Amino acid sequence: MLEGGFILLHRSILRWEWYGDLNTARLFIHLLLTVNYEPQRWQGIAVERGQRVASLAKLADETGLTVKQVRTALEHLKRTGEVTHTATSKYG
């Protein structure tokens, strides 16, 4: 887990449409804190700045949410354009 560095979080997040949805807000902030800050490789896959490799189960474990809660929160974030999902031939 990353322990160094910081992110800037603007107060306007208080007006963000998902701010009142605790699971979605928690997952979003967790993703902001855990994405790559520089390009890296993971098992032969290029993982760029702002990206990360994770399963639903891994995100659930890291956030304390259930897999179903993570899935729902990710759907919210994908639907409104905050996150995208890229599948590879090896990983869905």
Q: Where are the model-predicted features located?
A:
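Winged helix-turn-helix DNA-binding recognition segment
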Residues: 18, 35-92
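Short helix-coil-helix linker/hinge
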Residues: 21-25
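Basic side chains
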Residues: 11, 26, 68-71
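Long, low-complexity, charged/polar intrinsically disordered regions in eukaryotic proteins
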Residues: 1-20
